[in-house]
Amino acid sequence: MTKPLDGINVLDFTHVQAGPACTQMMGFLGANVIKIERRGSGDMTRGWLQDKPNVDSLYFTMFNCNKRSIELDMKTPEGKELLEQMIKKADVMVENFGPGALDRMGFTWEYIQELNPRVILASVKGYAEGHANEHLKVYENVAQCSGGAAATTGFWDGPPTVSGAALGDSNSGMHLMIGILAALEMRHKTGRGQKVAVAMQDAVLNLVRIKLRDQQRLERTGILAEYPQAQPNFAFDRDGNPLSFDNITSVPRGGNAGGGGQPGWMLKCKGWETDADSYVYFTIAANMWPQICDMIDKPEWKDDPAYNTFEGRVDKLMDIFSFIETKFADKDKFEVTEWAAQYGIPCGPVMSMKELAHDPSLQKVGTVVEVVDEIRGNHLTVGAPFKFSGFQPEITRAPLLGEHTDEVLKELGLDDAKIKELHAKQVV
């Protein structure tokens, strides 16, 4: 089967999550990904949050499928020479070292271009080059804070809240892959590689751009009418005082309010008293208002000017959601979802991780994949999120540390005697 990235050779210097998420996805698409790991220790996540002794952690395996691993001491002259040979054959190099680390190893961009003018050097950093904070190291939750996600997530009477989604790490890796694919396409036109960089702050901000939209609206109008703080006597501060936009100058935390212009809220369903995930998210789409009225048995609201326009009902949104919630008391979240679907109303259940892990539909479509792993035992991972009509990604287990060292060295043209010598010198 022809794969989208067949023939693309990727040198993967990444570790933890942002970079590995990028290179793993390239591996899913058929790229030849060689993970270059520090001799003797490898990617630190191999030992993080282990659920089984003496095997690589799920943290590592779930971000490093479809790769090969080589152990290499890049500080030795022989190690540096091997790396130079690999760069000459590479299409892409991906790294997420701290700022300036690659330069300190002796591999400046200028030197890399001398070795291979067609290679693309892709990097993930905390802040963009030229930013006042470009020297700072950034991890997942720091990125969520720096990019505006934490300040706008959570409830108004609580602290800034980080998301369970990896907005800083995996999201940055996906943005980086987009940049790499664009750079590969541009190389077809120019014949030369280039540097591609993604700042974690930028990647997070890209996903909260609607909050930048709201900041500009707030500065121009003084209010965000769809936010809970605009509802009469609904949102209160920690001292019990009602909140309003009279003294709010930055986009506030809106709880579970919808941010796309269509108001939404999290509503309880049957069983919520004992099941923390017995909720649905219900959206009041303007064009669906008549159907919503039919569903909740409020036909009189269809023609009532106090309800039948967004402007009319915006100051009553929370009261409306509370009323709708009463209709769900005798139905579980899946029954509510099907009920709403009969009217074409956007509504969905809150899916727990347990439910997702064992969802037969997700396994059928290849989103949740059982990885065959004869070393640590079979385990689940998330497959490619995109589906092709002419290509089905095959997910293979993550490599053991240095599992493919000799194989990769032979591809460079080294014979058995030379490989044995490099092992003896502890270069590989």
From Swiss-Prot:
EC number of the protein: 2.8.3.16
Subcellular localization, as worded in the UniProt entry: Cytoplasm
Effect upon mutating residue 48 to F: Little change in the affinity binding and catalytic efficiency, and it does not display major structural changes
Effect of residue 48 to P: Little change in the affinity binding and catalytic efficiency. It exhibits substrate inhibition with oxalate. It does not display major structural changes
Reactions it catalyzes: formyl-CoA + oxalate = oxalyl-CoA + formate; formyl-CoA + succinate = succinyl-CoA + formate
Keyword Kinase: no
Pathway the protein acts in: Metabolic intermediate degradation; oxalate degradation; CO(2) and formate from oxalate: step 1/2
Identification of the protein by name: Formyl-CoA:oxalate CoA-transferase
Organism expressing this protein natively: Oxalobacter formigenes
